[in-house]
Amino acid sequence: VGDAYKKVKDDLISGKQVLFSGTGCQVNGLKNFLGKEYDNLLCVDVICHGTPSPTLWKKYAEYQEKKNGGKLKGINFRCKDDGWVDFGMKEVMKSIPKNKVKKYFISKDNDSYMRMFLQDYCLRPSCYECTAKKVKMSDLTIADFWGINNVAPDMDDSIGTSLVLIRTAKGNDLFESANRNMKMKEVSYEDGVKGN
């Protein structure tokens, strides 16, 4: 997170409205760093599978650059252009020296990094004993709604369904102000988190 916590605190003290999003442990870390509640702070956490080793990512990125003859300029870890069941990684490479941009899609089943990640082989040690799974300090939690086909088949489509968990009154206010054009269905908390 670098110096993000300090920047958030500075913005909060100056009276700016701040929306902070991150993994559960990042949100919890911010709240602990701040040491008090701020009315002008809204926190959203993303249900997290875990965070892979930064060293492994660096080596993977270097490997892809060498293999594809370019510089990695962007990455979408869960690209769902072909639907959310067969997601994969979309990598944006800038070729050298021609300066052309190429996009590569690698299915989750064909990418060694994604396979290691999804099978929990490369997560940080703290992820295996994650305390943020049980203690949520965010106002809203968002995620892919894995298992929607079993809970609410009418909400299942090929592009994916999002799960929103409202955790505080502040989170509820934001959700109510943003949901006017959403197709929604309320489900139990247990059904919502079962696949995550």
Task: Place the predicted regions along the sequence by residue.
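Iron-sulfur-associated redox domains of electron-transfer enzymes in respiratory
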Residues: 1-196
